[in-house]
């Protein structure tokens, strides 16, 4: 058997295809597998997490106050184990035997500790590459293999010691392209570059002061680009009509999947670049399942679990719960409870007829409402059980999957869940019964390592490809190095010079940093030196800097053939891209649409009146009709992952629910048929709010507010939000105390909260929830709307008689009661505790904003009705006004004299600005 071996050949192989029997190209894993099979040695098939946890147990057993890793291990044992496991693997591959001399020679403390741990690890931790090579080298002395010769694609002197010990026992021939001489035709730019680079490599102490000027003949060609997708498409078009695919090698060190996707779009066979990721949907399920166990609940993680494409809870259920969380971030609030109550067979019949509603409720209880634990300690038993439940779900999905790619994904995810369970059971076997969140997260990172995409594969007739430049060890007609990425300019060891010297004295042959840098440079130069006819280098502009090879080329050479791809395409001046022979097709520039003040629809497509409106929808219809159309007719909305309310919106919602719960709890006279039927569930009538003092309010808040925050405003429980939570809590306490003072001063006898009302309005109905519906001693009703902030703006509304929201609520109550007079209306500002009113006739301590116009709330409502008719006439005719920036009102924008003034500017909270056109500043 003839083996072609290279340290970087476990991935794609750029060597020409061969039909010779008994000849194979292998990388490290492949060669070790062949040798172990030939020698009858058992393979090492452990999961990486198994090795990690085994070594962690050794570190734990050897740990005491004197160990160098002691303090770090207490904080993050998984990360420490991973780091030291890497040290161990590198040492073994460099020739370590697992010990240091015990003849009284002083050993550095860290090396001594590593040797002490190794006494345990040798028998417990699965073998490293270096240990397997040492085992193979020992057996080769007494056993034979089928390998007759090894053609080495690396410099033998640069191989790690363990590899040299194995290869020294075979006939080895070094491939000619390992130390290449210039291969291009003399007189070409490529030959000049090869000659100069070879000369510089031969005398590294020398330095070329003057740049070598090239002739730009295209034999060495640089393609500059910003977009990787566009450059990949250009390379794909270049290769589409190539007569001999085997004459070209493509290098893509990273993101080769972009190149393969471009090949597929251009009908070029895929090379088989792999796309490795730990973020595939199925791989995230295990992490999300376990992330829900920590206290406090993380609403962002909860929403991710619910909107994730996959999960152990049926998708219709997750979607319904996601809606609840998006409105009230938390678990157990009103929206959450309502969503669960709505989960019945009739609700699900159209989407999931086979779902068992009782099992669904049990699953909801298990996954979302189980006990949660502090981040410093969760029971291993609970975590193992949850991982097992996740594994059972993955196994069920695997058994029903029919697509091979999907099966591979679920199989890999199931293996990850099994690996986690084994790791957790291993910790339990060591006597540990709890694990901290940071340690579990590290462990999850290990078991859910990057996963390849089973749907990426090489196709027949492809060009040769590789992900490492060092694998090109023979002359090639054309080399294309796509995406020369930034690399760290410096390398370093985590060990001191004294420790390195001691390791060297004990047979651990670690190359110097200088030797590593020189070897890296030689590997980078190898593709250029092995190119015979043309070398194409694709360089992308990046904020991360440039590849050291690019830095060297730009410092030594000038005037090569170069095209800036993005500029060439955007200018439209190149019908054929120079040196690539790629024909470009001109595309007319399509400017982005600019904002228009009016959208025009055919009359037959005009919007009919909706049966039901609210103040919110009417406000959009009156002042920003395009928002009304897109929100309520087109039903567009922002994505749920971006839709968790926060800031004043969240705090205001929390305050509304708090007021509702408070008055329901403390007043037996609340309306049991309307606004308060969904209150906290606490028995009312404990004591009247009229008799409460500030200390009573504080005690009630101390008991009830933390639960409410966890249920409906859990964002305030996230790390870093402690100050926000304290400020919001203090604001709510102050506001509630001051609200009670206002109510007592006004002689309020009855308080109804979140009072739902629906009444006829012109030819439709109007619906709303009144924050506070009050009744004083005379029987007069007062509607109060609570706002988190905006005191100045709300005061100006009252002064100008533009408080349309209060007018809406007052109209509904006037209509419902048949009263002759309109209810009194006021705003309560939560952040200041002030009550804003047009006079102090009801609330003696109100901040008075006398109306500056000779109109009252009835006149305001009449103007609103005229505005509604005006806007409906426009919509019926297909006219939709778009009140956005960079548009000016037209004559059609002027409202009738008896309507509300249409003087509002663009809505700064408009969700649809990108759908209404692009202005010059976009």
Language model features with spans:
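Nucleic acid-machinery interaction/catalytic patches
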Residues: 1-506, 647, 651, 665-667, ...
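Short secondary-structure boundary/capping segments
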Residues: 165-169, 261-268, 493-499, 545-557, ...
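RecB-family 4Fe-4S metal-dependent nuclease core
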Residues: 536, 592-922
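An acidic- and aromatic-residue-enriched active-site/binding cleft used to recognize and process polar
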Residues: 155-158, 227, 252-257, 275-276, ...
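Acidic, Ser/Thr-rich peripheral helices and adjacent loops at domain boundaries
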Residues: 191-204, 556-563, 841-856
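Short, well-ordered loop/turn and helix-capping segments at boundaries between secondary-structure elements
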Residues: 292-295, 308, 482-490, 529-533, ...
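Extended, acidic-biased charged interface segments
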Residues: 550-606, 872, 876-879, 884
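C-terminal accessory regions
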Residues: 511-564, 867-897
């Amino acid at each position: 058997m003839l083996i072609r071996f290279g340290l970087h050949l476990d991935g794609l192989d750029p060597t020409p295809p061969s039909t010779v029997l008994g000849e194979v190209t292998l990388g490290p894993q492949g060669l070790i597998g062949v040798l172990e099979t030939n020698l009858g040695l058992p393979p090492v098939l452990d999961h990486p997490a198994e090795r990690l946890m085994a070594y962690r147990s050794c570190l734990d057993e050897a740990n005491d106050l004197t160990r160098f890793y002691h303090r770090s291990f207490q904080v993050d044992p998984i990360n420490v184990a991973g780091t030291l496991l890497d040290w161990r693997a590198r040492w073994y591959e460099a020739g370590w035997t697992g010990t240091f001399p015990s003849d009284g020679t002083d050993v550095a403390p860290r090396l001594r500790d590593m040797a002490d741990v190794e006494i345990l690890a040798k028998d417990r931790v699965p073998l490293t590459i270096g240990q397997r090579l040492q085992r193979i080298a020992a057996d080769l002395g007494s056993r034979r293999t089928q390998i007759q010769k090894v053609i080495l694609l690396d410099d033998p002197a640069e191989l790690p010691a363990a590899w040299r010990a194995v290869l020294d026992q075979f006939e080895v021939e070094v491939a000619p392209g390992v130390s290449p001489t210039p291969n291009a035709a003399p007189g070409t730019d490529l030959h000049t570059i090869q000659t100069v680079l070879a000369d510089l490599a031969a005398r590294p102490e020398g330095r070329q002061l003057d740049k070598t000027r090239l002739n730009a003949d295209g034999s060495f060609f640089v393609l500059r680009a910003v977009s990787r997708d566009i450059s990949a498409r250009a390379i794909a078009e270049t290769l589409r009509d190539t007569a001999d695919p085997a004459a070209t090698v493509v290098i893509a060190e990273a993101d080769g999947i972009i190149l393969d996707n471009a090949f597929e779009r251009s009908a070029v066979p895929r090379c088989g670049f792999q796309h490795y990721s730990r973020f595939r949907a199925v791989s995230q399920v295990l992490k999300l399942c376990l992330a829900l166990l920590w206290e406090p609940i993380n609403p962002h993680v909860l929403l991710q679990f619910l909107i994730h494409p996959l999960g152990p809870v049926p998708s219709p259920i997750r979607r319904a719960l996601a809606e609840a969380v998006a409105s009230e971030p938390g678990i157990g609030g009103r929206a959450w409870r309502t969503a669960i109550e709505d989960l019945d067979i009739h609700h699900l019949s159209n989407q999931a007829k086979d779902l068992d509603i009782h099992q669904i409720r049990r699953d909801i209880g298990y996954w979302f409402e189980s006990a949660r634990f502090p981040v410093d300690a969760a029971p291993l038993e609970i975590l193992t059980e949850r991982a097992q439940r996740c594994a059972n779900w993955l196994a069920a999905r695997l058994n029903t999957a029919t697509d091979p790619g999907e099966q591979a994904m679920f199989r890999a995810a199931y293996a990850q869940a099994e690996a986690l369970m084994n790791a957790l059971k291993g910790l339990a076997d060591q006597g540990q019964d709890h694990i901290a969140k940071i340690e579990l997260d590290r462990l999850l990172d290990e078991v859910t390592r990057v996963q390849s995409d089973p749907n990426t594969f090489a196709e027949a007739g492809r060009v040769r490809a590789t992900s490492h430049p060092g694998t090109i060890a023979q002359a090639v007609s054309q080399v294309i190095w796509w995406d020369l990425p930034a690399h760290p300019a410096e390398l370093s060891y985590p060990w001191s010079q004294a420790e390195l010297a001691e390791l060297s004295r004990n047979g651990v042959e670690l190359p110097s940093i200088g030797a590593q840098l020189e070897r890296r440079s030689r590997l980078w130069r190898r593709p250029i030196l092995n190119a015979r006819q043309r070398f194409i280098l694709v360089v992308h502009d990046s904020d991360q800097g440039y590849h050291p090879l690019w830095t060297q080329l730009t410092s030594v050479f000038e005037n090569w053939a170069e095209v800036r791809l993005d500029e060439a395409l955007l200018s439209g001046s190149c019908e054929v891209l120079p040196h690539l022979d790629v024909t470009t097709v001109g595309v007319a520039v399509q400017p982005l649409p600019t904002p228009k003040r009016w959208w025009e629809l055919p009359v037959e497509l005009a919007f009919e009146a909706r049966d039901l409106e609210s103040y919110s929808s009417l406000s959009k219809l009156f002042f920003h009709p395009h928002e009304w159309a897109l929100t309520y007719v087109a039903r567009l909305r922002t994505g749920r992952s971006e839709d968790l309310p926060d800031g004043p919106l969240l705090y205001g919602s929390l305050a509304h629910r708090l007021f509702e719960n408070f008055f329901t709890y403390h007043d037996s006279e609340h309306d049991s048929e309307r606004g308060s039927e969904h209150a906290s569930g606490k028995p009312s009538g404990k004591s009247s709010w009229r008799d409460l003092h500030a200390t009573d309010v504080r005690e009630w808040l101390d008991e009830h507010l933390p639960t409410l925050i966890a249920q409906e405003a859990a964002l305030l429980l996230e790390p870093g939000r402690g100050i926000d939570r304290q400020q919001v809590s203090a604001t709510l306490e102050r506001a509630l105390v001051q609200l009670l003072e206002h109510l007592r001063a006004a002689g309020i006898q009855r308080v109804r909260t979140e009072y739902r009302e629906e009444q006829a309005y012109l030819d439709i109905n109007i619906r709303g929830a009144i924050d506070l519906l009050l009744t004083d001693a005379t029987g007069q009703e007062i509607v109060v709307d609570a706002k988190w902030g905006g005191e100045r703006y709300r005061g100006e509304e009252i002064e100008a008689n533009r408080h349309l929201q209060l007018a809406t609520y007052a109209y509904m109550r006037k209509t419902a009661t048949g009263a002759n007079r309109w209810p009194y209306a006021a705003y309560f500002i939560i952040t200041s505790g002030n009550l804003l009113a047009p006079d102090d006739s009801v609330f003696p301590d109100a901040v008075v904003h006398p109306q500056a116009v000779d109109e009252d709330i009835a006149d305001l409502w009449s103007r609103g009705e005229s505005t509604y008719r005006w806007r409906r006439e426009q919509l019926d005719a297909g006219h939709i006004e778009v009140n956005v920036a960079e548009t000016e009102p037209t004559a059609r924008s002027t409202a009738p004299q008896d309507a509300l003034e249409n003087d509002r500017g663009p809505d700064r909270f408009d969700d649809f600005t990108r759908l209404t056109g692009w202005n010059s500043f976009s």
